[in-house]
From Swiss-Prot:
Family to which this protein belongs: Belongs to the MoaC family.
Catalytic activity, EC: 4.6.1.17
Highest taxon of source: Bacteria
UniProt catalytic activity: (8S)-3',8-cyclo-7,8-dihydroguanosine 5'-triphosphate = cyclic pyranopterin phosphate + diphosphate
GO BP of this protein: Mo-molybdopterin cofactor biosynthetic process
Active-site residues annotated for this sequence: 129
SUPFAM superfamilies per UniProt: Molybdenum cofactor biosynthesis protein C, MoaC
Encoding gene, per UniProt annotation: moaC
The protein's name in its UniProt record: Cyclic pyranopterin monophosphate synthase
């Protein structure tokens, strides 16, 4: 089986893949990533005392908005009618990390992997933005696709 990039034509020009002949099916993508912060920042996030307000609440909304805007950020992504997007947080006190997980659903003819990854990335960047006044050394890491369900290429699990 030959692997080839499908966003290029035979001359190497960037193209948007034609998904018009694909069946509309339910597709789900789950992505996650982490941000490591210092102890003061972790406590401010956990206790909701950051100067800019509810860090996780604002970050959640930013992530959902980003999922909806992915095609405006990633040049060859199709605009999608997302049917659901959730952003969840796990506070990890031992490592002073916040883990973000996004789950995006669509009933359509192309997947939502980029939407899930964009949601996680933007959520993490929003946490950074809201906390940078007290912690400029925060580190964002391990952004990755954990699971893809549905579509022509089948399911993918990376957990």
């Amino acid at each position: 089986m030959e692997n080839k990039f499908n966003h290029f034509d035979n001359e190497g020009n960037a193209i948007m893949v034609d998904v018009g002949n694909k069946n509309a099916t339910e597709r789900i993508a789950i992505a996650s990533g982490k941000i490591r912060v210092n102890r003061d920042t972790f406590l401010a996030i956990e206790q909701g005392t950051a100067k800019k307000g509810d860090v996780l609440g604002v970050a959640r909304v930013a992530g959902i908005m980003a999922a909806k805007k992915t095609s405006e950020l990633i040049p060859l992504c199709h605009p999608l009618m997302i049917t659901n997007c959730t952003i969840d947080f796990e506070l990890l006190p031992k490592t002073l990390e916040v883990e973000v997980t996004s789950k995006v659903k669509v009933t359509g003819n192309t997947g939502v992997e980029m939407e899930a990854l964009t949601a996680v990335s933007t959520t993490l960047l929003t946490i950074y933005d809201m906390c940078k006044a007290i912690d400029k050394a925060m580190e964002i890491s391990n952004i990755h696709l954990r699971r893809k369900i549905g579509g022509k290429s089948g399911d993918f699990i990376n957990e």
